[in-house]
Each structure stands twice: as structure tokens, then as C-alpha cells.
């Protein structure tokens, strides 16, 4: 710990915001099938709501097809209902104890709407990063005021926090740009 604030803790929190952003955009559907598409789906199972991946195995047998193998045969209809009600625009086809989910082509309007959602996720992550920065700066001001660190040390640490913030936000922008290209690719 550097006197004043814990830079490593701030970095860990900023990295957490980046990880959350990666997870959010991974669930956005692009032209290719990905098991992450079904991450937001929850199923009414055994008296409570559960993530789909806790009641079934999700695979990608073809580029435009997902396969969901339900572990408990009695859950097949609940899984189908959960996928249909998830607002992902998917129509599963029941095939015994599994479901096949063909992924329709994305039209231009849907692609633009997905890009907008990705931008919303990015903004949410940037706000979280700025909150971490603010917490760090407040800690520095308090340490400076309490005489724990001098003005020069406070200035140096605040520049480090700002540089870390800028780099983390640049990483969010880079990931957003990649996802945008992936979504808009026909």
C-alpha cells in the first residue's frame, strides 16, 4: 500500500468493471452462434429461478445453431418457455430431451439496436470506473488534508490514478469497437 490510497485496490476495482463489461457484451448476439447468448436466460426450476446453464448443457454444433441438452427430462418444457420468454428473439425446437435453437440472420435494425445496447453497457462501465477514480481522489485529498502524504506525493498519486482511469476507459472503448465491428459484420 502506498501512503494515502491503495492503488492496487483501485486497479482491481477498475479491472472488475472491465470484466463485467466483457461479460455483458459477450451475451450480445452477433452473426455467429455462441453459448453466451443464453447467459441472461433463467428457468423456473424446482421452485425458484435458475440460470439455464445450471439445468442444461449448451453447445454450438453449427455456426448458426445452438443445442441445449437438458439434464432432467421433466425440465424440457420449462427450458423452452424460459428461452421463448427471454426477449432474445429465439424459437427453440424441442427434440426429445434437448432443444435446437436456430439463430436467424440479424437485420440492420436489430444490429443497430444491439450496438446501442453495447454502448449502454460501455457507458455503465465507464461510470463505474469514474466512481472508482473519484473514491481514489477523495482518499488522496483526505490523506493530504490529514498530513499522511505531502502535496507532491498527492499530486503524483493523483496523476497515477488519472492515468490508470484513462487506460481502463481506453480498454472499454477498444472492446466496444471490436464488438461493434463484430455485430455490424454481415
Curated annotation (Swiss-Prot):
Keywords, comma-separated and alphabetical: Cytoplasm, Protein biosynthesis
GO CC aspect terms: cytosol
GO biological process entries: cytoplasmic translational termination
Signal peptide (UniProt feature, chain positions): none
Cell compartments where the protein resides: Cytoplasm
One Gene Ontology term of the molecular function aspect: ribosomal large subunit binding
Source species, domain of life: Bacteria
Cross-referenced CDD domains: RRF
The name this protein goes by in its record: Ribosome-recycling factor
Gene: frr
